[in-house]
Swiss-Prot record:
HAMAP family: UPF0434. Pfam families: Trm112p (PF03966). The lineage of its organism: Bacteria, Pseudomonadati, Pseudomonadota, Betaproteobacteria, Burkholderiales. This is UPF0434 protein BB2007. InterPro entries: Trm112-like (IPR005651). One of its GO terms (cellular component) is cytosol. Belongs to the UPF0434 family.
Amino acid sequence: MESRLLDILVCPVCKGRLEFQRAQAELVCNADRLAFPVRDGVPIMLEAEARSLDAEAPAQPS
């Protein structure tokens, strides 16, 4: 994921910062505990497509 794109993208729910998790191919919002998938290099920034991280440990920066 391009760092320039990461500088622009924000969580669609809270407008907070996102972290790219390379191993899971996801953009993670730690504030909302949501992980947005990245498919074929395209971030899917829809709340309905996000995976909840509530039951998991906090995401670690990659």
